């Protein structure tokens, strides 16, 4: 006996169709297992002042004699070289850790570690790719293990580029194979706050002076004095400027040199949202004309997204207007984009203009050098900005250690300047190439055109003919050939410089057995979607109808008609409308896909995709439909939107359906 669902204009809770928002405080997204409060009694003495209070969350650091800079751990032979680091971001902390592990005295000056330097909030979680994880392993295996444990693995799934409107795959990236073949860790995504706290704890609270903003320095030849915003001075043997894209150290080295505006502003947010394909897809870049959108799994049932839009810098949104503006900008795009926007609270959306810096040949002078964004700030499209800073930190510590060993062998003073130039020379070419790749990736993502006519104004009518744009076709051929080589070099090109690290992979990083099949077969990837399929009313005559949860039992199809049919096998769905025939259509399931069969209905059955292509289903012939398609029963007035969701039916009614039309 079939179970029957009646469809009419019965009242249904408005919650089913509400656009639910989820409160997502950025600073609570990734709780850590260790205490957020760190205390220190680290003492340094200023040349001008004493007794000043500092704080790192709740860190106190009084000023004492420079000669009382904490020594290296007992397990490491101290090396009489004091290194001053301007900036306690990821690059500065990684270098400080690497230098500390080599036995050097290190002091890190950070203007506001407790706020993740502001940029951590704007830039959200950070992708630590295989090359950077390997460098962390070479620096400190325990720290690398903790980062990989706290982070969310994305490299074991499909990643790549998709069409922003249709949601279809353009190019897939294989970041798993290059890592495994070279014995590297698999790419992770981790909260910036979590990463910074892991690094700060490993560096040691006694080494970091918070609330200390380096604004200038004096290179005295064999010594360097740093000058803080409050007038205090500290002396060291060298200075590393790791103070970000707006670096004061860089400015004082080379004069004022404006950062380059990318042409894009970026909105970012985190949503409590789990896509139906979470087990098979790690991150996606949705391509469009003068705009693009990036989404990534960051673990813990959350998704991070970035929305890029071409416009002049300095724009300001109206109060509580960011989300509304984004929904207008990305109107008509696929559900993967719109659902994330709808699931994000207004207060969780942040905006910043994107800048980078053109690579320069000279990174430093004398006993001063630069590291990370202070010298090679990149656009975020490659996910390699932080990774390059980590590689910088490893290489700089290595070159200083080589100089120290040479000094010990020859009995001569450490040649600090030569070691800094050696570091700069070893990093310059690789960083410049990846910087250029990041710019090129932004250009490609925002100039993508699916069909002829896109962006052509009066000729935009050509898009209805769906003639593939030549750039799209040629670009795909090029990327298919170049991407494997590029990824292999980006992820593994620095491995030979990691002294003492043995190539190795973790069994826990094992990918799905279907990964290779998913790369080669879009259909197999779609069939792997693990979620509930729903038909959501979107027609004029059935807005108040209940949603339909489709049955994945191959032996029990759904029968749609104007009246219930208790004498058929399966679920009978009754839609008492004049356009619906008594026995109108059947929805069946087979091998991970759903099919719609018209049962010789009087008014016909149609399927329309998200791009507007509409066709009539032939009688008695099963036609496959896909997520985001619209199914019309008899006419456009009785229509349903196909949606696949990870949520159970109970939570769907509780939280509300997202985009339904």
Swiss-Prot record:
Gene3D superfamilies: 2.60.200.20, FAD/NAD(P)-binding domain (3.50.50.60)
SMART domains xrefs: FHA
Residues that span the membrane, as ranges: none
Pfam families: FAD_binding_3 (PF01494), FHA (PF00498), NAD_binding_8 (PF13450)
Keyword terms of this UniProt record: Abscisic acid biosynthesis, Chloroplast, FAD, Flavoprotein, Oxidoreductase, Plastid, Transit peptide
GO cellular component terms listed in the entry, alphabetical order: chloroplast; membrane
Location in the cell: Plastid, Chloroplast
GO terms, biological process: abscisic acid biosynthetic process
Molecular function per GO: FAD binding; zeaxanthin epoxidase activity
Name this polypeptide is given: Zeaxanthin epoxidase, chloroplastic
Organism, scientific name: Prunus armeniaca (Apricot)
Lineage: Eukaryota, Viridiplantae, Streptophyta, Embryophyta, Tracheophyta
